[in-house]
């Protein structure tokens, strides 16, 4: 089953996903070191049996977005809904940039359920 990525991502591998899965076959485990929009994983063919899937990314806000989508999708959708004025957009971007860094990653690493749905929607 193929799922659409919930957001566009520069450098995404959506178009390459079928080629990648033909090359990989049907592994029981899959680790994505640079998840981005997770287009490859979301386009994984149906798999029978046990499987382990892991996505990673160095961008703390991206990790927060995936965690918030998993744990609190309705709240993320609420904050992602528009319309947004240009001033709001720039204010949100500045807010996110001011909070990006080692502290964000430490917060996410310190609690497997830590997430900020508002930031995920804004991101």
Name the predicted role of every residue range.
Residues 1-35, 39-48:
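S-adenosyl-L-methionine
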Residues 42, 47-123:
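Class I S-adenosyl-L-methionine-dependent methyltransferase module
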């Amino acid at each position: 089953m193929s799922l659409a990525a919930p957001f566009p991502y520069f450098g995404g591998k959506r178009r390459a996903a079928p080629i990648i899965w033909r090359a990989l076959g049907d592994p029981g485990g899959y680790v994505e070191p640079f998840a981005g929009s997770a287009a490859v994983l979301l386009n994984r063919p149906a798999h029978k049996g046990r499987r382990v899937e892991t996505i990673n990314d160095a961008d703390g806000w991206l990790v927060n977005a995936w965690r918030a989508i998993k744990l609190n999708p309705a709240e993320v959708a609420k904050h992602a809904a528009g319309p947004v004025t240009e001033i709001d957009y720039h204010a949100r971007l500045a807010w996110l940039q001011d909070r990006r860094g080692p502290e964000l990653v430490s917060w996410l690493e310190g609690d497997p359920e830590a997430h900020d749905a508002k930031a995920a929607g804004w991101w």
